[in-house]
Amino acid sequence: MKAIILAGGSGTRLWPLSRKNYPKQFLKLNGDRSLLQQTVERLLRAMPAEDIILMTNSDYKFHVLSDLNSLSLSVPLPASNIILEPASRNTAPAIALGIKYCVDKLGCSEEDVVFISPSDHIIKPVGKFIKYLKQAEEIAKKGYIVTFGIRPDRPETGYGYIKVRREASGVRRQAFFDVEKFVE
């Protein structure tokens, strides 16, 4: 499995803590590591550094490099896997560019599973997430598109929801469901 971390967003919904020049992924909200650092460390528990691609933009290049350097990883992410978007165009173009890099430079094929990860989420417990990530990889290898979600504990108009239909057909895992629709 490969991973593409999306770290080019401005994350301004958490204003005044995060702002365009210093967005949410670089904040240390729950300890001594930024959300980006936590994302990288989390994914390194599931795959080698050379399988992680980090998408950002030129405005955040030095924030990204600083965050990665301060992790003191025994095997750092290859510098060539840090991709600067030529222009900020939101999520889909960033993913497309990351996939193109994966195919052109890392030799990815249609059979490879690629996990798209935001850089600004707090995910706990990490061990449980890694377990589900490995299960999701196996399901994706069967031809499914897998999305992660959490059960909301209250209504929130600023986010979309995943409406599930039932336990996923052909998949015997309690935590996986067919998606009926996405509700915005």
Residue ranges of model-derived segments:
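Secondary-structure boundary/capping motif
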Residues: 1-2, 170
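Conserved N-terminal catalytic core of the sugar/cofactor nucleotidyltransferase
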Residues: 2-5, 16, 20-23, 28-113, ...
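Short glycine/serine/threonine-biased micro-segments
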Residues: 6-9, 29, 156-158
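Active-site metal-binding loops of divalent metal-dependent hydrolases
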Residues: 10, 121
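Flexible loop/turn segments at secondary-structure boundaries
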Residues: 12-14, 61-63, 155-157
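Active-site acidic Asp-centered loop
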Residues: 117-119
